[in-house]
């Protein structure tokens, strides 16, 4: 099984759409990222865990599941990088391949040492955009292949039905 660990605020700061949303609302940017990760998870079958720094919030770590994506807000004084390193170490085994999405160069080297593979923010964005295009194409194809609203009938059958409609039952 593949597991993707995502440095949430790193993606928000690197993806143009999310960066624009962040200017108005961090919460909206987080929600859109989680939604995109849910689509990614659904399409790839990979488990996805998005980690956000507690970001000036005091207290304990908070975990939640949103659209079947695991979301972790780190505890006070713990960075997303630190939490991702711990998760990568804890989840890594012979049956699991860990991927870490971050553009933080130091974090990339740290996770390499634990056997995890890295994806930059740009690589993950491209992958997500490719998946979105594939989903759109598939939806268009399925929609266009819907059966026609009418059943093709021969001219003779149409004439018979028209007679019946007019009450001529002979």
Curated annotation (Swiss-Prot):
Coiled coil: none annotated. This is Uncharacterized protein YacP. It comes from Bacillus subtilis (strain 168).
């Amino acid at each position: 099984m593949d597991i993707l660990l995502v440095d949430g605020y790193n993606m928000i700061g690197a993806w143009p759409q999310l960066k624009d949303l962040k200017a108005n609302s961090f919460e909206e940017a987080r929600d859109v990222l989680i939604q995109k990760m849910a689509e990614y998870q659904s399409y790839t079958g990979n488990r996805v865990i998005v980690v956000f720094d507690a970001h000036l919030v005091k207290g304990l770590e908070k975990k939640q599941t949103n659209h079947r994506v695991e979301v972790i807000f780190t505890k006070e004084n713990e960075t997303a990088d630190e939490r991702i390193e711990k998760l990568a170490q804890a989840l890594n085994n012979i049956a699991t391949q860990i991927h870490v999405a971050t553009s933080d160069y130091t974090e990339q080297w740290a996770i390499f040492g634990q056997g995890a593979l890295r994806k930059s923010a740009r690589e993950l964005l491209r992958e997500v955009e490719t998946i979105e295009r594939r989903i759109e194409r598939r939806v268009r194809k399925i929609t266009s292949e819907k059966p026609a609203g009418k059943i093709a009938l021969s001219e003779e059958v149409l004439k018979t039905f028209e007679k019946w409609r007019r009450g001529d039952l002979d």
